């Protein structure tokens, strides 16, 4: 099944070549056929989807359609969705039906985009392989024996398998970009605060950010137009004039300065990934870009800093899951404290419990200054490194991940090895900068390779311009798994 762009689908809908109901049904049929293998979706409700599609058809017929009205979309199961199960990939919320819509869901509904369902994810967004989900591991569409990346693995896999034309994801330490790289699609993490976190179940509140996942940069730009905007219900939402992220897509790259951080091309980078990224750099040079050697010296500390700060915030955020107000409750307990203990012991998976324990430890008396405050200081140094780098370059380029997808179960027993998958993505989260991943080739096993761009604050349009121009002269983003064609 080809992957028409979002604008092409919208044009077909506007020209009455296909109805939104027909289009939604095509994707629902594909989900029904492939999801038993890929496991990309946790919840699918054809009745709800087709009702939303019928409403979109009415808007189109009445001349009230927006740019993406009638184009269906999948949502990561971290966004509260009124009337839908919202599980966050956890036993703790396995039966939780959200009573309201997250801001991202509101925006997509207002744009007339029917929901195809809720996608699988690592439990509470904690993972890099989508193996920690209570609902089972997601399989990589390019090879079902391999992981799709995480935590937005279901979103990435469903787009790569053409089960949805686009999806929403979230990125706390690389959870949009890393699975996008491993599944051969395009994914963008916006500047922190550009997309409201209201109704997005919190992992680490100072790092979490929602963003688009789609085959191409142009698609991501169109979806970013939908989901950005100020929201008074999120205290970190930024008041900025609404942008059109498609406006600069066709600008030439003449004079573009591309920063290449030496730390991102050091020991530990897979040779095939390095070669693919080098080839992408050469393509950008042909388009008029120049390269600049830069250093992000403190980025080598990003993983230890992240695994102090993110678990600390998770320890606080996840304290609300206590079995009292909503979610799972242990069936048997002696008293209130016993209920808390058994509910959390039974309701959370091993990785979530590991991170809660780490977070509680670093926030405890005697360790707060030694770990948490020191990590916050290094976080500022990482942001400063980026600020200095952007004095000499317009975008920063490197690999999205040190390698390609790995086999299911290969790193499950080695948390540190798993955490290293986010080596190149975490620095942008710590600094609050926008970052995106786009396909730039395949390894010798036929698994996708991802190229990462990091921009200065609010430079999403510039990054999308670079990515779009690269995708005009390459076809990596248009490839699809042959077995699923």
Swiss-Prot record:
GO terms for molecular function: ATP binding; glutaminyl-tRNA synthase (glutamine-hydrolyzing) activity. One of its GO terms (biological process) is translation. The active site is at 76 (charge relay system), 151 (charge relay system), 175 (acyl-ester intermediate). The keyword Protein biosynthesis applies. GO terms for cellular component: glutamyl-tRNA(Gln) amidotransferase complex. Keywords: ATP-binding, Ligase, Nucleotide-binding, Protein biosynthesis. It catalyses: L-glutamyl-tRNA(Gln) + L-glutamine + ATP + H2O = L-glutaminyl-tRNA(Gln) + L-glutamate + ADP + phosphate + H(+). It comes from the Bacteria. NCBIfam families: gatA. Allows the formation of correctly charged Gln-tRNA(Gln) through the transamidation of misacylated Glu-tRNA(Gln) in organisms which lack glutaminyl-tRNA synthetase. The reaction takes place in the presence of glutamine and ATP through an activated gamma-phospho-Glu-tRNA(Gln). HAMAP family: GatA. This is Glutamyl-tRNA(Gln) amidotransferase subunit A. It comes from Thiobacillus denitrificans (strain ATCC 25259 / T1).
């Amino acid at each position: 099944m080809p992957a028409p762009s979002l604008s092409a689908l919208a044009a077909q809908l506007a020209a009455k070549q296909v109805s939104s109901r027909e289009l939604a049904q095509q994707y629902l049929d594909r989900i029904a056929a492939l999801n038993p293998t890929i496991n990309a979706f946790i919840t699918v409700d054809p009745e709800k989807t087709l009702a939303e599609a019928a409403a979109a058809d009415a808007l189109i017929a009445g001349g009230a359609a927006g740019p993406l009205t009638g184009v269906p979309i999948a949502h990561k199961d971290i966004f509260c969705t009124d009337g839908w199960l919202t599980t966050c990939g956890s036993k703790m919320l396995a039966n939780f039906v959200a009573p309201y819509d997250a801001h991202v869901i509101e925006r997509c509904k207002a744009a007339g985009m029917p929901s195809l369902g809720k996608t699988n994810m690592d439990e509470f967004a904690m993972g890099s392989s989508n193996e920690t989900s209570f609902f089972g591991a997601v399989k990589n569409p390019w090879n079902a024996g391999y992981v799709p990346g995480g935590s937005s693995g279901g979103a990435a896999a469903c787009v790569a398998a053409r089960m949805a034309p686009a999806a929403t994801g979230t990125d706390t330490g690389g959870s949009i970009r890393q699975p996008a790289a491993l599944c051969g699609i395009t994914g963008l993490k916006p500047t922190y605060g550009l997309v409201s976190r209201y109704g997005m179940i919190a992992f680490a509140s100072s790092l979490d950010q929602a963003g688009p996942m789609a085959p191409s940069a142009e698609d991501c730009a169109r979806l970013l137009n939908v989901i950005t905007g100020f929201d008074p219900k999120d205290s970190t939402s930024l008041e900025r004039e609404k942008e059109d992220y498609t406006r600069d897509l066709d600008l030439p790259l003449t004079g573009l300065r591309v920063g290449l951080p030496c730390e991102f091309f050091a020991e530990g980078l897979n040779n095939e990934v390095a070669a693919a990224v080098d080839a992408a750099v050469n393509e950008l040079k042909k388009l008029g870009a120049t390269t600049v050697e830069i250093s992000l010296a403190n980025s080598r500390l990003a993983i230890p800093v992240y695994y102090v700060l993110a678990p600390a915030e998770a320890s606080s955020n996840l304290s609300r899951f206590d079995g009292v107000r909503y979610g799972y409750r242990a069936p048997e307990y002696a008293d209130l404290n016993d209920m808390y203990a058994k509910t959390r012991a039974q309701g959370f998976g091993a990785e979530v419990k590991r991170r809660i324990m780490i977070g509680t430890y670093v926030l405890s008396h005697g360790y707060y200054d030694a770990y948490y405050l020191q990590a916050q200081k290094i976080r500022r140094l990482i942001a400063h490194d980026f600020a200095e780098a952007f004095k000499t370059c317009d975008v920063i380029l490197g690999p999205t991940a040190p390698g390609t997808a790995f086999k299911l179960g290969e790193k499950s027993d080695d948390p540190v090895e798993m955490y290293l998958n986010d080596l190149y993505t975490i620095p942008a989260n710590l600094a609050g900068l926008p970052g995106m991943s786009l396909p730039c080739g395949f390894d010798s096993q036929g698994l996708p390779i991802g190229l990462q761009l990091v921009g200065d604050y609010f430079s999403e349009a510039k990054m999308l311009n670079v990515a779009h121009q690269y995708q005009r002269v390459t076809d990596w983003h248009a490839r699809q798994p042959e077995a699923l064609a």
